[in-house]
């Protein structure tokens, strides 16, 4: 069950009959102004950097699946997370949702066997090589504008 999650879009169970659904999240530290990236260790794009996330199961909502994936991959999901949709990418085989989540400070992720490292890095200073899909996302102008707006210091 999701506790304390705020989202600006619907949280309904998704019809998986047409596409596979995946979701990922950019965790951003307010204190250090850096984003969390994970180094892949498995047979899907090994040695590439990505963000926490993965495939949503057929009986899960988008947010339930994202929360489960984060707990599995980094053993962390903020109790009162405010998730902001950044991008929705659709092709013939899958739909991938990318979210932004501000955390007060960096945390040390407890990695599962899918990942062998992590790094907190500044925007546009991402580690290389990035997962091909994430590379496209972070180099998309609209995404960069959204990230810039979301990471601006609020007075």
Show where each model-derived region lies.
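Conserved N-terminal beta-strand and adjoining loop/helix that marks the start
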Residues: 2-7, 11-35
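A conserved beta-turn-beta hairpin within the catalytic core of GNAT-like acetyltransferases
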Residues: 44-47
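A short gly/proline-enriched turn/hairpin at secondary-structure junctions
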Residues: 50-51
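Unchanged
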Residues: 54-143
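Short acidic DE-rich linear segments
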Residues: 153-155
């Amino acid at each position: 069950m999701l506790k304390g999650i705020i989202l600006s879009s619907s949280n309904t169970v998704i019809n998986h009959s047409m596409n596979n659904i995946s979701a990922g999240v950019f965790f951003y530290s307010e204190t250090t102004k850096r984003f969390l990236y994970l180094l892949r260790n498995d047979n899907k794009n090994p040695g590439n950097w990505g963000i926490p996330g993965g495939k949503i199961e057929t009986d899960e909502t988008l947010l339930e699946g994202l929360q489960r994936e984060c707990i599995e991959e980094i053993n962390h999901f903020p109790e009162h997370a405010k998730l902001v949709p950044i991008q929705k990418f659709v092709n013939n085989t899958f739909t991938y949702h990318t979210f932004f989540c501000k955390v007060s400070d960096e945390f040390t992720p407890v990695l599962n066997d899918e990942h062998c490292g992590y790094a907190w890095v500044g925007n546009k200073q991402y580690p290389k090589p990035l997962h091909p899909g994430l590379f496209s996302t972070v180099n998309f102008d609209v995404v960069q504008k959204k990230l810039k707006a979301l990471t601006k210091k609020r007075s």
